[in-house]
């Protein structure tokens, strides 16, 4: 009362009050002295205090309320934090865990007032649903808007996600043990707001106060229509907003999963039926394309602070749908069913909107090249394990050319025989590490050495062709003349012919000499 006493002495009045009473009939009375203490008029004094108290109470009511809350629920990766950060205008951010707290700045230009709206984001894991007690309690229940976020890039999870998180809210509200009378009042308010929805017109009052007053006057004269059979059957007592994020993925669903317009109408019809049951609004958004982001903010401040908005319902664009609470009904949803060609109204959502099969990409195993020395050591160990080939068996790994050997040099057989020193038959084994060409030459050398050793080792036998012990000199004159022509390669048939000629001479070869297995194989 001391402060009020100081107000009574207008010489020491605060600047705000001095300007308030600087004009008007009350100021005129004060200037004339009729309202001063000398007049002694108690009635005028009471009028003065009434005007002051009325002005103060009006200003306090016009301020934006504090303690309003928005609670976001949805699956992991649905874009809850991204949505709020985009509304805030923040590009870079870090996602929280458990229960995340953010806020929105709310500014009223008409009254030049601002406040903050609390935003609570619950983690998509049901393990964290116990944290709801910190964001939604019995005191803040009346001042809370529930936002259910759905990922439209995965439409097959939309309906299950909405039902799951709505049941989480229902379960939590029941645990708060709100008095039945208070809960009934909240439910009736939600029904009344739904029934009294008016389509935005062209003429809107500039001030939210006047809009509220005008709306109350219109409500007294208007006739409230009854609710539909499927409307507000699951009344939470809280305003609900369903936000479908990532609607830019609709084009991807059309290209990759063969979605058509009737599929998107089918999805929208089921989501709108869910919204009717909870009295919720529906907004399709895209953070990537910045679509309907500001619309979400405007709807929040309209529901929590009574701000006006002039945005009508939008149902034509399949990726920018906006349906405010109270606008929709079963007949309007039935318009979507008229576009069905292959689908039916009674089809189950899970049977039509199914999760596509996961395509497993077959990645070829990367082959790492071994070190050259390691590779050669392994190859050597493999060749060493193979059984050795018989010394006299001609093994030729090279492909044969018709009419001759691929490695036969351009010289006569006699020169080959003469150039090789005599080695006992079977005394030389083929090296498994030797290349194919070297192996062929070694087999031929062993073959001719076995012939020479047999001829020189015969007891008392004269040399072939009249020269004792000189097989090479005796064999040279008897070769066919065709083998000595320049440019002509000797063939294997010449060798067989020479061997046949040697075996036909009984005088040159001893009958007791056993035939070499190598010679038999070669013949």
From Swiss-Prot:
SUPFAM superfamilies: P-loop containing nucleoside triphosphate hydrolases
Cysteine disulfide partners in this protein: none
GO biological process, one term: early endosome to recycling endosome transport
UniProt KW keywords: ATP-binding, Cell cycle, Cell division, Centromere, Chromosome, Cytoplasm, Cytoskeleton, Dynein, Endosome, Kinetochore, Membrane, Microtubule, Mitosis, Motor protein, Nucleotide-binding, Phosphoprotein, Transport
A UniProt-annotated Pfam family: DLIC
Any one cellular-component term (Gene Ontology): spindle pole
Residues modified to Phosphothreonine: 213, 408, 512-513, 515
Signal peptide (from-to): none
Localization per Swiss-Prot or TrEMBL: Cytoplasm; Chromosome, Centromere, Kinetochore; Cytoplasm, Cytoskeleton, Spindle pole; Recycling endosome membrane
Ligand binding (ATP): 74-81
Keyword ATP-binding tagged: yes
Keyword Thylakoid tagged: no
Function per UniProt: Acts as one of several non-catalytic accessory components of the cytoplasmic dynein 1 complex that are thought to be involved in linking dynein to cargos and to adapter proteins that regulate dynein function. Cytoplasmic dynein 1 acts as a motor for the intracellular retrograde motility of vesicles and organelles along microtubules. May play a role in binding dynein to membranous organelles or chromosomes. Probably involved in the microtubule-dependent transport of pericentrin. Is required for progress through the spindle assembly checkpoint.
This protein's name: Cytoplasmic dynein 1 light intermediate chain 1
Species whose genome carries this gene: Mus musculus
Lineage: Eukaryota, Metazoa, Chordata, Craniata, Vertebrata
């Amino acid at each position: 009362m001391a402060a009020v006493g100081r107000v009574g002495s207008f010489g020491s009045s605060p600047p705000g009050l001095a300007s308030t009473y600087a004009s008007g009939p009350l100021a005129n009375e004060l200037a004339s002295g009729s309202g001063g203490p000398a007049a002694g008029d108690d009635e005028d004094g009471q009028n003065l205090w009434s005007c002051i108290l009325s002005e103060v109470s009006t200003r306090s009511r016009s301020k934006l309320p504090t303690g309003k809350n928005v609670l976001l629920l949805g699956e992991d990766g649905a874009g809850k934090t991204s949505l709020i950060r985009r509304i805030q205008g923040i590009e870079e951010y870090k996602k929280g865990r458990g229960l995340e707290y953010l806020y929105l700045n709310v500014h009223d230009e008409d009254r030049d007032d601002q406040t903050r709206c609390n935003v609570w984001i619950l983690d998509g894991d049901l393990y964290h649903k116990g944290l709801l007690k910190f964001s939604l309690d019995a005191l803040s229940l009346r001042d809370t808007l529930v936002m259910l976020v759905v990922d439209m890039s995965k439409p097959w999870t939309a309906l299950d996600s909405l039902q799951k998180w709505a049941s989480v809210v229902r379960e939590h509200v029941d645990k708060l043990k709100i008095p039945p009378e208070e809960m009934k009042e909240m439910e009736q308010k939600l029904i009344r707001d739904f029934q009294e929805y008016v389509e935005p017109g062209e003429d809107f009052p500039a001030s939210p106060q006047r809009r509220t007053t005008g709306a109350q006057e219109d409500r007294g004269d208007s006739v409230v229509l009854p609710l539909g059979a499927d409307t507000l059957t699951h009344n939470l007592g809280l305003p609900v907003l369903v936000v479908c994020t990532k609607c830019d993925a609709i084009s991807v669903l059309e290209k990759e999963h063969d979605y058509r317009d009737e599929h998107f109408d089918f999805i929208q019809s089921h989501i709108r039926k869910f919204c009717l049951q909870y009295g919720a609004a529906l907004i399709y958004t895209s953070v990537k394309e910045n679509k309907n982001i500001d619309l979400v903010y405007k709807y929040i401040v309209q529901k929590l602070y009574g701000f006006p908005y002039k945005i009508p319902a939008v149902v034509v664009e399949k990726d920018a749908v906006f349906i405010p609470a109270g606008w929709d009904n079963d007949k309007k949803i039935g318009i979507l069913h008229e576009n069905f060609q292959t689908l039916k109204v009674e089809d189950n959502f899970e049977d039509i909107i199914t999760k596509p099969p996961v395509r497993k990409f077959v990645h070829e195993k990367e082959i790492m090249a071994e070190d050259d020395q390691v590779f050669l050591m392994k190859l050597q160990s493999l060749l060493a394990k193979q059984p050795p080939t018989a010394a006299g068996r001609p093994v030729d790994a090279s492909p044969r050319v018709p009419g001759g050997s691929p490695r036969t040099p351009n010289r006569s057989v006699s020169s080959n025989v003469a150039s090789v020193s005599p080695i006992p038959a079977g005394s030389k084994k083929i090296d498994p590490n030797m290349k194919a060409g070297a192996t062929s030459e070694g087999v031929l050398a062993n073959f001719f050495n076995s012939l020479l050793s047999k001829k020189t080792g015969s007891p008392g036998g004269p040399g072939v062709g009249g020269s004792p012990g000189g097989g090479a000199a005796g064999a040279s004159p008897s070769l066919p003349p065709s083998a000595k022509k320049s440019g002509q390669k000797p063939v294997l048939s010449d060798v067989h012919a020479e061997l046949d000629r040697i075996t036909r001479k009984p005088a040159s070869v001893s009958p007791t000499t056993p035939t070499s297995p190598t010679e038999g194989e070669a013949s």
